[in-house]
Amino acid sequence: MPKKSFQRAERISVQIHRDLGALVQAAVRDHGLPSMSVSDVEVTRDMAHAKVFVTALQAERSFEAVAGLKALARELRMQLAHTMRLRFVPELHFHYDDSLDRGERINTLLRDLIPPADAEKDECG
């Protein structure tokens, strides 16, 4: 029985991710929020809460983006209730997904470690 519940939570996560992505884009346009996208959604097993991870295109405005979505959470949840066929839509909790920022920092560090090809040729002779 628990396996069925997990599969349902996963299906609902995917559906919320898809539907909320469109709603977030509309909120960006309508409310002047920084440009962002939904990167992941995790729904609890009891379907009461959903962690929504968002990525802002401008990392320096990430706090503003998440704060704007938190202010609109109730409205977004009501809009989801109209599009989804659920008796109860999970409460939305927005979090900034910094994985892209961390990945970019790692790429920068790796690029700095690799010596330029011209410098290697000069050293070899």
Swiss-Prot record:
GO terms for cellular component: cytosol. It comes from Xylella fastidiosa (strain 9a5c). Transmembrane segments: none annotated. One of its GO terms (molecular function) is ribosomal small subunit binding. Keywords: Cytoplasm, Ribosome biogenesis. GO terms for biological process: maturation of SSU-rRNA. Its main location: cytoplasm. NCBIfam families: rbfA. It comes from the Bacteria. Belongs to the RbfA family. HAMAP family: RbfA (MF_00003). It is found in: Cytoplasm. One of several proteins that assist in the late maturation steps of the functional core of the 30S ribosomal subunit. Associates with free 30S ribosomal subunits (but not with 30S subunits that are part of 70S ribosomes or polysomes). Required for efficient processing of 16S rRNA. May interact with the 5'-terminal helix region of 16S rRNA. Monomer. Binds 30S ribosomal subunits, but not 50S ribosomal subunits or 70S ribosomes. This is Ribosome-binding factor A.
